Design a protein with these regions (language model features):
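Short alpha-helical packing/oligomerization segments
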Residues: 88-131
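Hydrophobic transmembrane helix segments
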Residues: 29-76
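Terminal transmembrane helical module of multi-pass membrane proteins
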Residues: 130-161
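Hydrophobic alpha-helical transmembrane segments
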Residues: 67-82, 120-125
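Membrane-interfacial loop-to-transmembrane alpha-helix junctions, especially the N-terminal start
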Residues: 28, 85-96, 140-143
Length: 161
C-alpha cells in the first residue's frame, strides 16, 4: 500500500469516527473509577440507611440488589455530568450502556470482602466507561447503537455465566 492509499484509508476512518484524545480517554477512565467508587459507597449507604430499616423486618434477600440499582442511577447522574464536562461524544449513551451492562454488580460481588467489592466496582466502571466511550465514537447513530447494544448484550450474557 502506498502513501496515497494509506492517507485515503485514514481519511475514510476519520469521517466515520469522532476523535477521542488520549487525555480525554484517561479522564473518562478516571471518571469511570470515581463513578464506581460512588456506586460502591451509595450501595452500602442506601442498603444500611434506607432499604433495611424501612423495608426489611426480617431477612432481606434483595436489599443489596435494590440498593445497587438505586446507587447505579444516582451515580449515573454524577457520571453523566462528568462526561459532559470532559466533552465526550454521546455521554448519555455511555452512562446508560454502562449502567445496563453493570446492572446487578452489587449482587455479583455480594459475599466478597469489602476491599474486593470496592476493587471490582471501581475497575469495572472504569473499563465500562472507557469501552463505551470508545464504541460511541462511530459517527452514524444507528451503527453506534448496534455496536453498543451488542456489547451490552454480551456483557449481560457473560455476567450470567
Amino acid at each position: 500500500m502506498d502513501d496515497v492509499e494509506s492517507s485515503e484509508l485514514s481519511n475514510r476512518w476519520d469521517n466515520l469516527l469522532i476523535e477521542l484524545q488520549p487525555q480525554q480517554l484517561a479522564q473518562v477512565v478516571v471518571l469511570g473509577a470515581i463513578t464506581g467508587l460512588i456506586v460502591w459507597i451509595l450501595t452500602f449507604l442506601v442498603k444500611q440507611a434506607v432499604i433495611v430499616p424501612l423495608f426489611c423486618s426480617g431477612a432481606c434477600t434483595n436489599a443489596t440488589d435494590v440498593a445497587g440499582v438505586v446507587a447505579t442511577v444516582l451515580a449515573g447522574a454524577v457520571g453523566l455530568m462528568g462526561l459532559v464536562r470532559v466533552g465526550v461524544y454521546r455521554p448519555l449513551m455511555i452512562v446508560i450502556a454502562a449502567a445496563i451492562a453493570l446492572g446487578g454488580l452489587a449482587g455479583w460481588v455480594y459475599g466478597m470482602a469489602w476491599y474486593q467489592t470496592l476493587f471490582w466496582s471501581v475497575a469495572l466502571y472504569a473499563i465500562a466507561y472507557a469501552a463505551f466511550a470508545w464504541f460511541v465514537r462511530i459517527r452514524p447513530l444507528i451503527p453506534a447503537l448496534i455496536v453498543v447494544v451488542g456489547v451490552v448484550i454480551l456483557a449481560r450474557v457473560f455476567a450470567v455465566l
